[in-house]
């Protein structure tokens, strides 16, 4: 059974709590951790569009929030960017 949800993932905490040279990698980890927590699964696959959105303005200027569409198929969670 497939389960589909739309989330707005806040990344403001990542911006405020990390040095400028580590913001994008930490944002990617924060997205993955958010989806693990909310979808209750350990296997999370992020689409390349999410990666491009976070890294769009370089390492230290990440977006404040990201909207993603998440589909859970069994134990696997797949996320794609909305916009």
Curated annotation (Swiss-Prot):
Cited Pfam families: Ribosomal_L31e
GO function terms (MF aspect): structural constituent of ribosome
InterPro entries per record: Ribosomal_eL31, Ribosomal_eL31_CS, Ribosomal_eL31_dom_sf
CDD domains: Ribosomal_L31e (cd00463)
SMART domains: Ribosomal_L31e
Keywords, ordered alphabetically: Ribonucleoprotein, Ribosomal protein
Keyword Ribosomal protein: yes
GO cellular component terms, A-Z: cytosolic large ribosomal subunit
One biological process term in Gene Ontology: cytoplasmic translation
PROSITE patterns referenced in this protein's UniProt entry, alphabetically: RIBOSOMAL_L31E
NCBIfam families with a match to the protein in the record: PRK01192.1-1 (NF002258)
Family indicated by similarity: Belongs to the eukaryotic ribosomal protein eL31 family.
PANTHER family: 60S RIBOSOMAL PROTEIN L31 (PTHR10956:SF0)
Protein name according to UniProt: Large ribosomal subunit protein eL31
